[in-house]
């Protein structure tokens, strides 16, 4: 976007249109709650966030939408003023979640400290890009755990790829500390599978977080899509069933476990009440033509009815025809 904007190829209206199209795809797929990271700071200031807020306005009665201010580096020390100013502007604009990339910062501890300081001051949630690398020594998740513990701030750590590179004896106590701090971990299979492991042509790592160690420790494990049809992931259709299928295939999860990562676990990470088929529960539901969770993930049926608060907010129908063959 930044390069295209500088070249005059894409402007505000085009950004708004693209975001609306993405939200339409999500809603049609059955998504009634979404969190998206928007670059804030540096040369873009809050322009992308302004476009996202405008695009989301027409969808807010159909789905819950919150934006993360993914703050440019650095967030502390020399050169941080412009980024922190943009972050404060984003907070004024109403961004719900504060984010950053501590593992890419010159001082990860100061970055995480600043994020939690602002989150506490402005009563915001925290969602950080954490350790998106195959380097097992990159463990800024420890900083996130330390600041999250006892803070009362709803905290999410996305990616956490390096955890998947650790031996069991090292990852187990770390996973237990994540669970104790009530930090949700988000695996992002589409983008992590595409980006990670390019320097390892033999026995290429999958680039996913330590899925089973985290689950065994009681961590709230979530799965998301991250990028869709951009330079970081050329494909992707904004369909949670695609994400769940990758968690089954690449993460060796059972279908019911994978489905939880895109549904109930995701709502928990967002601070939303759990949904169950009971009187009095939120009627945020998706109806698909499938006889089981496994079948729904495997076939990702196109026919879908999406309900939000008991009202139908999206409906998709598809028809297959097999005309007679002329012989």
Q: What positions do the PLM features span?
A:
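Alpha-helical scaffold segments that flank or form the walls of functional sites
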Residues: 1-37, 46-58, 85-92
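Active-site mouth loops of central-metabolism enzymes
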Residues: 1-18, 68-81, 101-105
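Short beta-strand segments at enzyme active-site cores
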Residues: 31-37, 65-68, 187, 223-225
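Short glycine-rich or small-residue beta-strand-to-loop segments that form or flank ligand, phosphate
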Residues: 35-40, 127-129
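Active-site-proximal loop/turn and secondary-structure-junction residues that shape catalytic pockets
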Residues: 40-42, 69-75, 103-104, 132-136, ...
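Histidine/acidic residue-rich metal-binding segments in metalloenzymes
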Residues: 47-61, 78-158, 162-184, 201-223, ...
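His/Asp/Glu-enriched, well-ordered alpha-helical/loop segment
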Residues: 125, 146-155, 191, 195, ...
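C-terminal cap of metal-dependent C-N hydrolases
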Residues: 264, 279-327
């Amino acid at each position: 976007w930044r390069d295209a904007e500088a070249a005059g190829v894409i402007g505000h209206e085009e950004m708004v249109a693209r975001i609306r199209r993405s939200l339409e795809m999500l809603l049609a797929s059955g998504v009634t709650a979404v969190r998206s990271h928007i670059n804030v700071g540096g040369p873009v200031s809050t322009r992308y966030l302004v476009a996202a807020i405008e695009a989301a306005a027409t969808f807010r009665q159909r789905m819950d939408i919150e934006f993360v201010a993914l703050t440019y580096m650095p967030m502390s020390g020399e050169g941080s003023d412009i980024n922190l100013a943009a972050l404060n502007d984003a907070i004024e604009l109403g961004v719900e979640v504060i984010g950053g990339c501590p593992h890419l910062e010159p001082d990860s501890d100061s970055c995480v400290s600043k994020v939690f300081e602002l989150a506490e001051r402005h009563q915001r949630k925290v969602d950080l890009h954490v350790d998106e690398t195959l380097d097992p020594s990159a463990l800024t998740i420890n900083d996130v755990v330390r600041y999250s513990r006892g803070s009362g701030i709803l905290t999410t750590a996305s990616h956490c790829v390096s955890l998947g590179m650790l031996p069991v004896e090292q990852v187990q106590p770390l996973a237990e500390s994540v669970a104790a701090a009530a930090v949700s971990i988000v695996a992002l299979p589409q983008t992590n599978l595409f980006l990670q492991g390019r320097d390892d042509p033999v026995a290429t790592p999958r680039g996913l977080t330590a899925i089973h160690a985290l689950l065994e420790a009681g961590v709230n494990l979530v799965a998301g899509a991250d990028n869709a049809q951009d330079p970081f992931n050329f494909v992707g259709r904004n369909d949670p069933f695609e994400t769940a299928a990758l968690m089954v295939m690449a993460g060796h999860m059972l279908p019911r476990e994978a489905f939880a990562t895109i549904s109930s676990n995701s709502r928990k990470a967002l601070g939303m009440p759990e949904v169950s088929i009971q009187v009095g529960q939120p009627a945020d539901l998706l109806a698909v033509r499938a006889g089981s969770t496994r079948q729904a993930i495997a076939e990702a049926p196109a026919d879908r009815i999406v309900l939000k608060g008991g009202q139908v907010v999206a409906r998709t129908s598809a028809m297959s025809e097999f005309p007679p063959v002329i012989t």
